[in-house]
Amino acid sequence: MSRLGIMVLTLLLLVFIVTSHQDAGEKQATQRNAINFRWRRSFTRRAATEECEEYCEDEEKTCCGLEDGEPVCATTCLG
């Protein structure tokens, strides 16, 4: 094989390695962002649930969740 052919193959291999490494980094960053989002969402939901339970406890009812940011209290929750 000529030197030009070897140089072209080496260049193609180098381009392939660099692009696959970048793709792996983007996938890892996407996964990390998804995990962070899930954690923040669960933390927010937990805080809202505690507030709802405290609010409904004063009325001696069960917290059924939040609707439009307001706690929904009932003796028994449906669905």
UniProtKB/Swiss-Prot annotation:
InterPro entries: Conotoxin
Keyword Coiled coil included in the entry's annotation: no
Main location: secreted
Keyword annotations from UniProtKB, A to Z: Amidation, Cleavage on pair of basic residues, Disulfide bond, Knottin, Neurotoxin, Secreted, Signal, Toxin
Post-translational modification Leucine amide, affected residues: L78
Highest taxon of the lineage: Eukaryota
One GO MF term: ion channel inhibitor activity
Residues making up the signal peptide according to the UniProt record: 1-20
GO cellular component labels: extracellular region
Location in or out of the cell: Secreted
Free-text tissue specificity from the UniProt record: Expressed by the venom duct.
Disulphide bridges: C52-C64, C56-C73, C63-C77
Maturation-removed propeptide residues: 21-44
Family: Belongs to the conotoxin O3 superfamily.
Domain characteristics, as noted in the entry: The presence of a 'disulfide through disulfide knot' structurally defines this protein as a knottin. The cysteine framework is VI/VII (C-C-CC-C-C).
Protein name as it appears in the record: Conotoxin ArMSGL-0121
Organism (species): Conus arenatus (Sand-dusted cone)
